[in-house]
Amino acid sequence: TDVEYLNSGGGYLQSFDGDGFTAQAGASGAANVNQLNIEYIYMAWKANPTHGGVSAGKMAYLVVAGGGSGGWNSATWDGAGGGGGVITSYGTQSGGDSPVQPSLTLASGTYTITIGGGGTSNSGAVSVSGNNSTITGNASITCVGGGGGGDVTTSPLGTGRDGGSGGGGSNYSGNALGGSGEPSQGYQGGQGSSSNGGGGGGAGKPGLSDGTGGDGIYCSISGTATYYAGGAAGFNGTGTAGQGGGGTGKNGGESPGIALAGGSNTGGGGGASTQPGDKASNAAKSEAGGSGIVIVKEKDKANGMFNMNSHFNSNVKGQWPIADKYQIGNSGMFSS
């Protein structure tokens, strides 16, 4: 099975997952790695642990930054949040329609992983861009947080904020442009129109002027093909959120007029909202972008022993959701 469980005799982790990780019973709690000689070994962290060493060599990765939040205003139709930037060495496409990047070549040292949070939700006039996700050490990768949706504080007025993927433009002061995407990480946000805010850009496609968010990147590095870093839908449009965790826009006159947030650990953008005229609702607000994620897996065999104690410690503290066993959903570090 793909479930961690305890050895009843020694009280130590007996099986990590179905790929052949096994742990020896006894005081050491150590594990023989890659018993079945599979092609990839998955490694993941959820709650800031420090893990034992892994063998030097190639490591495939997916890095996704946090998505931007949507715009909000009492009189305009604001833009949606853009998806976070994406860089990956796995599959056929990286962010911004760039080719996949080379795998990391691990040298001896410590590598720190930081997961970017999504831009925060807001019932005021300011959208918030997402935060960067990074891998740092002897190798360095930085994905830029998604741009916030256009609002009355952006310059020129109503333009989407730049980011990994750009936020959608508002209809304030005409049809404001969407924000730009980071080269080789994501696309621009959609332009606002007379009837709606622009959709947020996604890592795989741009946002559109009808409020449709751009799709994210489709990647199966976790073992399940999933979209990441989709753009959100702009306010009041007929468009939908992009695939990859993007939130949807809301009319502030609806009850409640709260937009939908980007999905956690997807890097999706947050939806936009407004309070139009006599339909004002105190509950109306834009929503947050989704937090980012990092997924890594080591290619080929690992040599020697891999200490599983930290995995078990995370599990017993309730910090290791089974569904996320390949994912790094918070900050952490590993050594090589």
Spans of features found by a protein language model:
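Intrinsically disordered, low-complexity regions enriched in polar/acidic and amide residues
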Residues: 3, 13, 23, 34, ...
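A structural detector for beta-sheet-dominated domains
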Residues: 17, 24-26, 107, 188, ...
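Alpha-helix initiation/capping motif
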Residues: 1-2, 129, 299, 324, ...
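Charged, alpha-helix-forming regions
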Residues: 1-51
